Amino acid sequence: MSSDAAAVADRDGSSPGHGGHAHGSLGAMVVGAVGVVFGDIGTSPLYAFRETFAGHHPLPPDELHILGVLSLIFWSMMLVVTFKYVAIIMRADNKGEGGSLALLALINRKSEGKRWGKGIILLGVFATALFYGDSMITPAISVLSAVEGLTTVEAGFAPMVLPIAVGILIALFMIQSRGTAKVGMLFGPIMMIYFTTLGVLGTWHIIGNPHVLIALNPWYAVRFFMEEGTLAFLAMGSVVLAVTGAEALYADMGHFGRRPIGLSWLVFVLPALMLNYLGQGAMILSQDMATALRTIHNPFFLLAPEMLRLPLVILATMATVIASQAVITGAFSVTQQAIQLGFIPRLRITHTSAGSIGQIYIPAINWGLMVMVILLVMSFRTSSNLAAAYGIAVTGAMAIDTCLIAVVLIHLWGWNKALAAPLIAVFAAVDIAYFGANLTKVPDGGWFPLLIGFIAFTLLTTWGRGRMLMINRLREAAMPVKVFVQSAVNSAVRVPGTAVFMTSQAQGVPHALLHNLKHNKVLHERVILLTVKIADAPYVPESHRVDFADLGQGFYRIVINYGFMEDPDVPAVLSRTRTCGPEFKMMDTSFFLARQTLLPSERPAMAIWREKLFAWMLRNAESAMEFFKLPTNRVVELGSQVEI
């Protein structure tokens, strides 16, 4: 991202604690947040507590271990979700937007030219790469764990679990192109009912065994580690499943605002979750060991009386579908941001709602996710097996968030290092402990999100590096505009109409203009050199949308500024531009684009295999014509070769 773009972003300023740009009454925003933000963390009770006692490193379901695990879950929620994300990280918004890429864009303004800048950018990109691995596992484990509840209704349902889960997931991905704006209105009320049910079921069992409430004392977590050091460390790999989805609170801040999300977490979601976890523990503690060993394989659904288990399965399935929808929508949003920030090649993006700018659909991401999610379900077959693959990507991303927030505290907010260091040390210690515990899962399935993360990281960094090299090569070969204008106007024939030459750089003469003059020997009476720039902010105000310069002799330079959450529409902006003569008439305007063909070279800038990978990505990127919404019958593409 350029310093010019950062300057545009800085015009509005940014300060800690920005409340977001969501609109609506507080009550409506709280209900909306419950329906979208908390789906992932809200479905964790289906498998998190179970996995510590029936997973790959099972603990005996006795009082020491149950109270220790419950204490770890509670204090993890308090430290990681409440303190780290709600109290600290959610104050580091980028003009109201949250998420790793928004935070990275915010930091980028202060990191240019700094020694640590490149490392921080790579960390942020890796967090984005890990997100794609997580977005494949979340729908698979959530829906599968809910459908597995059918076996608590009738054991004979077991063979039907896999096909039902696959059918639900396929249907979910198939409807994405139609958008979810209409059914999305039901997400909030459904999740409100779901969380209320969690709390009621948990409270019912806590009343029967209130002794379980002593687990809220951190001493029981400490005692767990003192008496069962290795087992307690391994158990953290399952305990962390209770806080997966915490990063969604920050990522979705732009949609609902910091206050509604924080309020709904503290007042409603956190109590409901903890009541349910404590209820599961109370139920197991009330049973003899033989019964407990059977119950622990599905304690969530066994909280309900037998006659209510089928309705609970249906409700839980609806909740997991909503959680999966939030993850899929998040993947679309993150991809759009990454495209605008220059980490992913242009992809086809369609809007599924005329009334909501955030309702988008990216076919390539949708079908790619669907294939991988179905493969995961068919390969791992049970949610318990999938739990072994879950967590490592989340804990890795959380650790990176800690690194990014450290930069924000010291370099953006100006905290004293002596004050920031202890806070960051606590966050880092927790993140490292959870990440280390999850590394033990690598042989059992943890390799999958790491593999996806490294593949995505390779693609993201290859595109980012290749794109920068290509821009630099084009800039090196560019002719100064002043020289071109002085020489061309005296030798070229001028024809009626307007020619718009798009270029990625706001300096020099576009290659498409040079090629057009070389082959056609004419210039239009009005020539626009147009650059679209993406700022380090999510949105750019209309007053700063267009920068204009009159170059003389009928030549004009126009720079259109967009935020990384905005959808470029070049004709719409040009139709409102009055700075370079009469208004634009599309039927009198031609758009000239350069289509670059890459020639891999022996230059040391990139390895040959990465040059070839970048060339393949460039060939398969969506054309600038479609991405910038240019009228197809007014576009001329001119080829050029670039050696990087």
Curated annotation (Swiss-Prot):
It is found in: Cell inner membrane. This is Probable potassium transport system protein Kup 2. Transport of potassium into the cell. Likely operates as a K(+):H(+) symporter. The keyword Ion transport applies. HAMAP family: Kup. GO terms for molecular function: potassium ion transmembrane transporter activity; symporter activity. Belongs to the HAK/KUP transporter (TC 2.A.72) family.
